[in-house]
């Protein structure tokens, strides 16, 4: 698991310093700098990726020959996206970038649509309250504003900023990470699908995809 986390942080562009520590909150999965990500937040990313996979390959993909490797890939990808999001929030603070009232209202609407569209089984799996979920939509929108504000030099700025940060993993909680075992998972809208309906497509995961494609060709 430690190797997997290190790889995921590297894919997010932030893998310079990985520190194992104790003293985490009950649901705190990892820390980057002075921000954190909880397990419920991480599960939103993971569930979103799982939905996409099951829509393409079917619910039983995880029991097929390459199911385990695909599972490991999306667990890693979800961690990469969550890590990248949290770093971009720190950049937003540094650059004094904030959402407008209108953008906050859009995030509130998106959260309501997403939450109401979840099945009871999905809500139980995520174990996330609506306020945290609303903030996650806000954070996603804020990260996109950071990306657009920096422009063409974003990756250089991001990589440079990452070298100043420490990364702390709640290893015992990380060991509990698992996919949702929900048969009709693909029938409900995913987080990114709802987000794009209100804010347009996000660039948050694009660098992750590029890095993964590079590795697959090496």
How should these model regions be labeled?
Residues 1-7:
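Sec-dependent N-terminal signal peptides
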